Each structure stands twice: as structure tokens, then as C-alpha cells.
Amino acid sequence: RAFERSDPSRPTIAHSGVPPHLPQLDGTDSHLWFGWRQGAAGDLAVRARRLPRMVRFVSEFGADSVPNSADFVGVSRWPHIDVERLATDHRYDREIVEVMFPPDAFETFEAWRATTQRYQSHVLKVQIETLRRLKYRPTGGFCFSILADPHPAISASVLDHERVPKDAYETVRDACAPVIVVAGLPPDWVSPGDRLRLDVHLVNDRRTPLDDARVHATATWAGDRQTWTFGGPVDADDVVQVGTIDLTVPDTLGEVLIELAAIDVKARVERKQRLPGWLRNSRAG
């Protein structure tokens, strides 16, 4: 109220993370921890479809991971770690970490750390790309949970307390590039004969248009591949659906990998990306 009285021209909120509710149907900015505190990483897109106002500005999202500067963890008796000390002093979220990535399921500390970092990268990549695809429709911006730790911690940061990058640091930088190509998130498992339709979008945050943008998509599986090419202009500061990957899952064991490459022919700018995760044929096991 003091802020409102001082400057009524500026909107004010009591605090962030308030979902829409009666009588304040707009809510405030959102804290959406899909893939960590609830659900899966792709559930952010589901929430956006069902309640668009929840993603107008998302100010917290991500997943915790073990940092590279990790002497404080104490792993001389791996996999036995002092979880009480880590929870009290170093933000170790035992209830979640030990369900998703129980230390005793990993032979080494290094394998445990790498797995948590790869998962964090997956969550941030999927959700940043989702929010950018929804640019202005309705997303006006986002801020993932933590950039850098102020002290030794197992947290959602992408830089640890020594400013050593985690795996997610490069992932975030790539996902926040001025021009990206984004495809719909595929299911984790598929069966032979299933039909996949994944919409492909080009996001252009530059102040200049992409006059002749091309997207090349390639699906690869054991012994074969299928390709698609889409193209067209993309205005400055805009998002355009350039095409749809329409794939019938092959009758083969193993993984199906989908890769995308976006090229601005005139500017000779190229962006490549691999779809998050693998499509695993359910017959593989």
C-alpha cells in the first residue's frame, strides 16, 4: 500500500508466486516446478494450455543438481553421505533427490552428479523452449530459479558457489539464443505403427526478420532415416510454426532420434538442436 500511495502509476503486488484466485483472477508471476516438485518437465506446456495466465511470467522453475565444486558433500564412504548436514547447511532436498536419484543406485559419486546435472539440463531446456514458443501468447518473460549459488549448495543454480558452470549453463545459453527452432515434446515411449505429429516452430527474438528461414528435420533409427524440410519468412520479434514432423514409428527395436537444424539462408546463421530425450520403441524393453 505504501508503494501504491507513493506511485500509483506503477502496478504493485504483495509477493510473487500467487496463482489466479478469487477475487484476484489474474494472480501474479508463477512458480512452476514441473519436473521437480511435481509432475514431469513437459507438464509446463500442459498447464499453459489449460490455464494460459499461469505462464504470463514464470519467475521460478528448474531442478536441483549436484555442483562440480563439491568437496563439501563428503563422499569418502560413498554412497553414504551425511544427508542431515547437507539438508541443514547446503540446501539438499532429501525428499526429492533421494526419490529421483537415490545415491545408493549409483556406483560412483561422479555418476550421481552427472545424472543430476543432465536431468537439470533437460528440465530447463524443455521449459525455456516452451515459454519462448509461447512468446506474447501469453508469455511475456521468464526467470529460472537460480543463476549462481552464494554458498556451497545442492540447488537449482547453473553456476556453483565457485562460479564453475554446471551442464545446464550451456543448455540455458543455447535455449536463450536469439533464434531457436523448437519442436513439440515427443512421448517417452512409442510402439511400431504409432503416428507422431510434432509441430515445429521458429522463434526469432532479433529486431530484424528472417527473410528465408529453412528448417531441416531428420529422424534416425536403426538402419534408416526420414527427413523433412520447411521454410519461409519469420518477422522480427515473432514466433512462426513452420511445419509439422509427421512420422509413423518404424517396426524396429531401439531408439528413434530426431534432430533439427534451422538456417537463415540470407544471413548464413545456423542453429542446430536435438530433441529432448529419445523416442524409445516399446518393443525394446
Mark where each language-model region is:
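Active-site neighborhood of glycoside hydrolase catalytic domains
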Residues: 1-23
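Substrate-binding clefts and catalytic carboxylate motifs of secreted carbohydrate-active enzymes
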Residues: 3-4, 13, 40-212, 216-220, ...
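A general structural motif
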Residues: 9, 139, 253-255
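A generic structural motif
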Residues: 14, 230, 273-275
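C-terminal cap/loop subdomain of S1 sulfatases and analogous C-terminal strand-loop tails that border
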Residues: 19-49
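Surface-exposed loop/turn motifs at beta-strand-loop junctions within extracellular Ig-like
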Residues: 204, 221, 262-266
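Intrinsically disordered, low-complexity Pro/Gly/Ser/Thr-rich segments with frequent PxxP/GP/PP motifs
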Residues: 213, 224-253
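Terminal connector regions
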Residues: 241-243, 248-285
